[in-house]
UniProtKB/Swiss-Prot annotation:
This is Bifunctional protein FolD. GO terms for cellular component: cytosol. HAMAP family: THF_DHG_CYH (MF_01576). CDD domains: NAD_bind_m-THF_DH_Cyclohyd. It comes from the Bacteria. It catalyses: (6R)-5,10-methylene-5,6,7,8-tetrahydrofolate + NADP(+) = (6R)-5,10-methenyltetrahydrofolate + NADPH; (6R)-5,10-methenyltetrahydrofolate + H2O = (6R)-10-formyltetrahydrofolate + H(+). Homodimer. One of its GO terms (biological process) is purine nucleotide biosynthetic process. Its EC number is 1.5.1.5, 3.5.4.9. Pathway: One-carbon metabolism; tetrahydrofolate interconversion. NCBIfam families: PRK10792.1 (NF008058), PRK14186.1 (NF010783). Keywords: Amino-acid biosynthesis, Histidine biosynthesis, Hydrolase, Methionine biosynthesis, Multifunctional enzyme, NADP, One-carbon metabolism, Oxidoreductase, Purine biosynthesis. The keyword Oxidoreductase applies.
């Protein structure tokens, strides 16, 4: 068996096209285009790349993208004041603050200051809590994107044993909640987990998000399992690899996300979907 690649680039383009059609219909109906505010503090090169891709994606689908590039010397008070301003801006449907933030700024304070109905990253405790209670509104982008990928490939989740490796607030924890909602029996593994291999070997679906190259040996993957690799790591050679040993895993899996071109593009596609949802549901007068 050789696994079928799950093509995140293709699916993300489909999602963007669907959103672009909805934007066009809104504008033709005399309604304003959705607006996204993207806030970058400091000059972290990786953050600049991510922010650039998000801004381009917005413009492609017809959103109004407002950019706020702040110096690394920006204080927490100044950043919170900007968020207050954006919360009150009737033409902004989503507020995205690129993480990580410089030392001296508490990311929790910042994320909690964003109005839950403009929290298009899905990080606000209110939105995570809604997901936990099975009534999601704005959902965390990477886990939402993964669910979209699995859905578009008609991969049945109900009744499957899913193992999530990694327990971060951005991916692992909300991913666990998404999989519970989808009907999986879900195990979350983290740095204190004993016998990681034993857990992975039992999984019908493995989602790995630890940020360590080739962390999960391909031979651990059960025959016919689905592998979702969230990691993106650059080796000294310059090659990009995931958190799973791809070539070996592909011999056992039924479906696998490649790196690059798997999960990555779906994160931005989900951000676009969330902004559209916020605009239609929360900021359009019925």
């Amino acid at each position: 068996m050789t696994a079928q690649n799950i093509d995140g680039t293709l699916i993300s383009q489909t999602v963007r096209s669907e959103v672009a059609a909805r934007v066009k219909a809104r504008v033709e109906a005399g309604l304003r285009a959705p607006g996204l505010a993207v806030v970058l503090v400091g000059e972290d090169p990786a953050s600049q790349v991510y922010v650039g891709s998000k801004r381009r994606a917005c413009e492609e689908v017809g959103f109004v993208s407002k950019s706020f590039d702040l110096p690394a010397t920006t204080s927490e008070e100044e950043l919170l004041a900007l968020i207050d301003e954006l919360n009150n801006d009737a033409e902004i449907d989503g507020i995205l603050v690129q993480l990580p933030l410089p030392a001296g700024i508490d990311a929790t304070h910042v994320l909690e200051r964003i109005h839950p109905e403009k929290d298009v990253d899905g990080f606000h405790p209110y939105n995570v809590g809604r997901l936990a209670q099975r009534i999601p509104k704005l959902r965390s982008c990477t886990p939402k994107g993964i669910i979209t990928l699995l859905d578009r490939y008609n991969i049945e989740l109900r009744g499957k044993h899913a193992v999530v490796v990694g327990a971060s607030n951005i991916v692992g924890r909300p991913m666990t909640l998404e999989l519970l909602l989808a009907g999986c029996t879900t195990t979350t593994c983290h740095r204190f987990t004993k016998d990681l291999e034993g857990h992975v070997r039992q999984a019908d679906l493995v989602v790995v998000a630890v940020g360590k190259p080739n962390f999960i040996p391909g031979e651990w993957i059960k025959k016919g399992a689905v592998v979702v690799d969230v990691g993106i790591n650059r080796l000294e050679s310059g090659k990009l690899v995931g958190d799973v040993e791809y070539d070996k895993a592909r011999e056992n899996a039924s479906f696998i996300t490649p790196v690059p071109g798997g999960v990555g593009p779906m994160t931005v596609a989900s951000l676009i979907e969330n902004t559209m949802l916020a605009c239609e549901q929360f900021h359009t007068k019925k």
